[in-house]
């Protein structure tokens, strides 16, 4: 079987590389399944404290591999919703629910589901040459992989409408100026910058970071009172964690903390 997903665990970081460079790492069914298997490992393995996603070759991910769908214009209409339900929706839900930081290093073009996958990660770093392309509309399709949810939240409604309906290229620099991504770095520095950040997160109190991630997600729909109550509950949970006790002990002893993520 072809290996469309490369994974490596080192120093608490799982690096996942989309590995179909001849197709700009476009998604196919086998890639989806291999990625799902890696994410299950990341969820279950307590030694994995941070996830880093990137692409092989000159692109990050060009979205769905249209050749994999074998759409025959003269045949019956395909059920594209089935692939969304079977692959993309579980992928988005898994990344959102993962109680660990997820970093995306966009090393080239990110189009369609590749763009929305990247922008849905917790922290997005992009090479200076990278581009984001919401290509759905050019095929007569609607955004998937969480695109219609994440775009208004990271770019604002007006820009989300323009990006999704026009389908124009968006440079990494412009995405950073609009606040859609965390940082743009020179192409040659992307890998090292992303890995340094991931290794930093892997040494941090990731139990609390997971609660921060969940609190921010729930803030999208909560009222102020609901969010204040949630902060109370999460602070109670964080205060009972091993990480909090270690952080305070290390501070008082003037030594570096050794967090466990628990």
Label each region the model flagged:
Residues 1-2, 249-262:
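Terminal low-complexity tails and localization/encapsulation signals of metabolic enzymes
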Residues 1-56, 93:
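Conserved CoA-thioester-binding segment of acyl-CoA-metabolizing enzymes
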């Amino acid at each position: 079987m072809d290996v469309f997903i490369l994974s490596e665990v080192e120093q608490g970081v799982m690096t996942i590389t989309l590995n179909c460079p001849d197709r700009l790492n476009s998604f196919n069914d086998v890639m989806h399944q291999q990625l799902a298997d890696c994410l299950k490992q990341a969820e279950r393995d307590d030694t994995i404290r941070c996830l880093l996603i990137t692409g092989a070759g000159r692109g990050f991910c060009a979205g769905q591999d249209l050749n994999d769908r074998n759409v025959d214009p003269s045949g019956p209409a395909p059920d594209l919703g089935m692939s969304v339900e079977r692959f993309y929706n579980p992928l988005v839900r898994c990344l959102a629910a993962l109680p660990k930081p997820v970093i995306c290093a966009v090393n080239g073009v990110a189009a369609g589901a590749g763009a929305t996958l990247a922008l849905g990660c917790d922290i997005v770093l992009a090479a200076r040459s990278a581009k984001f392309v919401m290509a759905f509309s050019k095929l007569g399709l609607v955004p998937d992989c969480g695109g219609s949810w994440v775009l208004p939240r990271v770019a604002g409604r007006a820009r989300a409408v323009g990006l999704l309906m026009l389908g124009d290229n968006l440079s990494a620099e412009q995405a950073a100026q609009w606040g859609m991504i965390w940082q743009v770095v020179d192409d040659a520095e992307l890998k090292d910058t992303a890995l340094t950040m991931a290794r930093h997160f892997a040494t941090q109190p990731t139990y609390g970071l997971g609660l921060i991630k969940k609190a921010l997600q729930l803030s999208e729909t909560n009222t102020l009172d609901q969010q204040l109550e949630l902060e109370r509950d999460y602070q109670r949970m964080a205060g009972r964690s091993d990480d909090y006790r270690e952080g305070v002990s290390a501070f008082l002893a003037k030594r570096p903390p050794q967090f466990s993520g628990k």
